[in-house]
């Protein structure tokens, strides 16, 4: 049988997906985090892999799913949170625009799986399955009640799950994880299709969503999940030392308020008293596409007048950020390679060929 006859759609998918293979898995495993630092990698959306100087590995909001894949149904799902928010009927054209940079089934070394809330792009059954099948049998799954309900429903043993609410602290080796208030108002209108939100006092945010502060020996990381802007960021900034803060950024479509704007990101950073602010989530959905350079432009306009004590950092999915080594950088660039040029003699027709 010829090559073109033996190749199938399934063989094509298996040979190309996930796009990065186990490249990033291997990079994370091989990383030796220096004392006085922490390293983290952006997995897409709000997914983060954090590694401490003691070699502790935790992942937050690692999601391996996708968005719209067909025009088949032109209507939004009845009762969807965006329908409740804006009174829309048409299908939301949210296509995933980010490649899959980490293979969940190639994960071997992990000390905790965390989720900030139960929206589909922040918690993943494939990640849960991979960790249950391939990793140590004591790796905990940490999140608010709605996330634990999902994990248990998927088959994660209840005793492997830890329910957290604001004020709770969980120690995972040398990382101290503080659950803090979340400000994700979209989560409050994520309800069963037959349940009405109009005129009804929402149930508590604390069972649905949390923010996290990761205190490591080498510095502290604030993860805001899908939180909108809130005055309470200032309270968190008063109560905790925050070195790096991550905020969900995006260009909200007409009639929608679901992501922080560039101004919100700057206000969040100022309120938290962070040293570095990094936008995320803007990478993932085609209809929330936003340019993070806007944050830097506004920062340049305001930093001297408002005496900002922080810098913005523009990241790339799959890229690494090391605190404090990268604290004065403004943008990430993937490794360019070719640092070993001319270690062997080039094989060219003549020296001036190139």
Curated annotation (Swiss-Prot):
Pathway(s) the chain acts in: Cofactor degradation; L-ascorbate degradation; D-xylulose 5-phosphate from L-ascorbate: step 1/4
Function: Probably catalyzes the hydrolysis of L-ascorbate-6-P into 3-keto-L-gulonate-6-P. Is essential for L-ascorbate utilization under anaerobic conditions.
Organism field: Salmonella gallinarum (strain 287/91 / NCTC 13346)
Protein name per Swiss-Prot or TrEMBL: Probable L-ascorbate-6-phosphate lactonase UlaG
A molecular-function term among this protein's GO annotations: L-ascorbate 6-phosphate lactonase activity
Name of the gene this protein is made from: ulaG
Subcellular location, record wording: Cytoplasm
SUPFAM superfamilies from the UniProt entry: Metallo-hydrolase/oxidoreductase
Induction field: Induced by L-ascorbate. Repressed by UlaR.
Annotated EC: 3.1.1.-
Family: Belongs to the UlaG family.
Any single GO BP term: L-ascorbic acid catabolic process
First and last residue of the signal peptide: none
GO cellular component, one term: cytoplasm
């Amino acid at each position: 049988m010829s090559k073109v006859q033996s190749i199938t759609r399934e063989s094509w998918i298996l040979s190309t997906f996930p796009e990065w293979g186990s490249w990033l898995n291997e990079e994370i495993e091989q990383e030796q985090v220096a004392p006085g630092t922490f390293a983290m990698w952006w997995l897409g959306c709000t997914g983060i892999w954090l590694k401490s100087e003691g070699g502790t590995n935790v992942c937050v909001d690692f999601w391996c799913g996708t968005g719209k894949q067909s025009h088949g149904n032109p209507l939004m799902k009845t009762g969807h949170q965006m329908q409740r928010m804006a009174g829309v009927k048409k299908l939301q054209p949210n296509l995933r625009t980010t490649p899959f940079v980490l293979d969940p089934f190639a994960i071997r070394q992990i000390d905790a799986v965390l989720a900030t809330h139960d929206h589909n792009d922040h918690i993943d059954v494939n990640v849960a399955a991979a960790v249950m099948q391939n990793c140590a049998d004591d790796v905990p799954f940490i999140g608010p009640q709605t996330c634990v309900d999902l994990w248990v429903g998927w088959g994660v043993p209840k005793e492997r799950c830890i329910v957290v609410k604001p004020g709770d602290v969980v120690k995972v080796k040398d990382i101290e994880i503080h659950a803090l208030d979340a400000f994700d108002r979209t989560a409050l209108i994520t309800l069963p299709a037959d349940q009405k939100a109009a005129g009804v006092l929402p149930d508590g945010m604390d069972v649905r969503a949390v923010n996290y502060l990761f205190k490591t020996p080498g510095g502290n990381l604030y993860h805001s999940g899908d939180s909108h802007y809130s005055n309470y960021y200032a309270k968190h900034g008063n109560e905790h030392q925050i070195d790096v803060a991550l905020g969900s950024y995006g260009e909200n479509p007409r009639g929608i308020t679901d992501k922080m704007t560039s101004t919100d990101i700057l206000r969040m950073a100022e309120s938290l008293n962070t040293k570095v602010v990094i936008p995320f989530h803007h990478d993932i959905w085609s209809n929330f596409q936003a340019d993070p350079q806007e944050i830097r432009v506004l920062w340049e306009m305001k930093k001297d007048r408002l005496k900002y004590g922080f810098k913005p950092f523009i990241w790339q999915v799959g890229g690494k950020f090391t605190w404090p080594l990268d604290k004065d950088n403004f943008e990430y660039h993937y490794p360019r390679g070719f640092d070993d040029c001319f270690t062997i003699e080039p094989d060219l027709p003549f020296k001036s060929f190139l």
